[in-house]
């Protein structure tokens, strides 16, 4: 890292470490304001800023109010998060900074004393996890989310096949391999400018974590069916389900945010999908939903959640969420799941999912729903995936984690309505 890159990183961290805005939004805004920054500059700034987020527990132990000392925070991130030797950056340092980094390296063993610093997790989250996990499980989780995430992409089966697309990417020197579970997935260990790639522009490829691809498999949409994506967002899972249906049948994509649904429309066009009807709703109780009561073959609820399964990509979330925000989400999730269940026809399927690792948002939410809705029963996810020739057994629920499965942390439950 050179002096100019360090200066830019410090300016980014001064804003990012207040945790008032999503980190990716802060970074994008900064790069828009500094259009002359080259590709390598942006890479160095982004990697160091995200290293500061991943190692914020240790940095905040060494520095009071890191956002008020962003240059030191950036230097600490280089040493703690990017394995930079002090000798490599000695020309950037004054005497005080050299002493600070020397003390920081000397304190590395001290940082392992507290579970929150050892796992790089805030105290509130450690306390939540301690209700269900052992100390070793918490430490393993902390290690897994501090690893950079690969880029997973999905082959749109309307436009191509994985066994044809994969060799093309490998021929371009992309470090590409088939995902181990999803039959449509490709994993890129080295990120490329996919949004400019011909196969992305023509709709053959779509960015999507393997966990989300498996969720689309669990929905099990068939041609000619009525499908509801109750919390569609920008529509990544909607598109995967649509490809399964080959434009035969109808998908209703609902969301409360018009902006997110607006992003779905160009993606539909690029993917060659014509059977998706997107509509903004005011809430899960919107009267426009009532017309589908008891008519849907499949209903997907990718519920609003804490997002704590995505910490590899969004390390700031653990500081932007709290026990209070999670508690508020629980009632919202329950209300949405209850409302969505009314759309499912007899023998139809209701799939509940989150990108959280907290049992309160996951298993406990499903157990509460089943206790209130005896007309539904749980379908074993492992058996369902086995029937789809997916060799993955996480039990009756789909539970994915970054350490074991190299995906985002993910949860799903499949519920079937009885006759």
Language-model features, listed with the residues they occupy:
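Rossmann-like S-adenosyl-L-methionine
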Residues: 163-419
